[in-house]
Design a protein with these regions (language model features):
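Catalytic lumenal/periplasmic loop and adjoining terminal transmembrane helix
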Residues: 14-156
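Membrane-interface junctions at the ends of membrane-embedded or membrane-associated helices
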Residues: 1-18
Length: 159
């Protein structure tokens, strides 16, 4: 009888361990390349608003690919502004040379921009400093979320 209980307990431990490991693999694949979001599962959504989600700024390349793919002006330059502290220029490194040449980064000169990108990482508190406020002549065209957590947003100028 004690041997059966021990074998049964060992099987339960193995099954629970296996479920935990499988879940970890699943979440890492689901969140790739934003694996740091795995830890957000331990917090509620209200708390996650207080933390940087895209701290390595991986979303820049993804947002730039989206902008290029959705732009109708094939031969012209695309002017991209940045409403966050994260520099955009090195986000283009994961793009082909042809796509890189289409992009012109204008910093926070929103008047020159066709698109504005933000990953909500700011140098200062936006409650008091409106450096990154999106102008009224831009409209939101993309929200990228994982598990209802906003990673980045792209705006397009209204013509």
């Amino acid at each position: 009888y004690p041997i059966l209980i021990k074998k049964f307990n060992n099987k339960i431990v193995y099954i629970i361990s296996l479920l935990i490991v499988v879940n970890l693999f699943y979440l890492n694949i689901k969140f790739h390349p934003y694996q740091s979001l795995y830890f957000v599962n331990f917090l509620n959504l209200k708390i996650t608003d207080n933390y940087q989600v895209d701290s390595p700024s991986l979303s820049r390349s993804e947002a730039l690919k989206f902008i290029i793919e959705n732009e109708k002006k094939n031969d012209e330059k695309i002017y991209v502004a940045n409403a966050s502290w994260t520099p955009m220029y090195n986000g283009k490194d994961m793009l082909s040379i042809t796509k890189q040449r289409k992009l012109v980064f204008v910093g926070q000169e929103y008047g020159q921009a066709d698109y504005i990108y933000t990953n909500f990482i700011y140098k200062s508190d936006e409650k008091y400093n409106k450096n990154y406020k999106i102008p009224a002549n831009f409209t939101k065209i993309k929200d990228f979320k994982i598990n209802n957590i906003l990673i980045y947003r792209v705006y397009k100028k209204i013509k």
